[in-house]
Amino acid sequence: MNPRAWLTGIVLALGLTIHAAAAEPENTIFMDLEHGRVVIELLPDVAPQHVARIKELARAGFYDGIVFHRVIPGFMAQTGDPTGTGRGGSEKPDLPAEFSSLPFERGTVGMARTANPNSANSQFFITYADAPHLNGDYTVWGRVVDGMRHVDAVAAGEPPSDPTAIVTMRVAADVAE
């Protein structure tokens, strides 16, 4: 193996690990899947109401056990519906759109909604690849900073025959490690 390539790989891996560890705990989500932990950096400056909702629901244990009900390879994985059908949500009121100029790239976390732009509630999705057709039409509230390989391992389907579930989802500040 080329020593320069090896060293570059080590530096990149360390950089990602340090970035994930150095993230502000109050604005970091730990989403544990059966395959491992996904670390999501929250973006409260971009979508304050959506970030507040995600944190509120995570702190209440709302997402624990909820399945990824819509997973399209090469596009996105969607979860956050307690019924597992894509039609449900929390008992909280829907949120107004907080669209931004942030692009949907691999690992972007956005809020799912109906055709009504002000209908986001608890469902969210993580993009597998750049999705420019979503830009400006869906609220971006986070980005995966570590563990995207675990999102890649989520079972595909609409719905998947054996769906992957969120084991636990917590605000990092609330997790003792």
PLM regions: where:
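Cyclophilin-like peptidyl-prolyl cis-trans isomerases
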Residues: P3, L7, V11, G15-E177
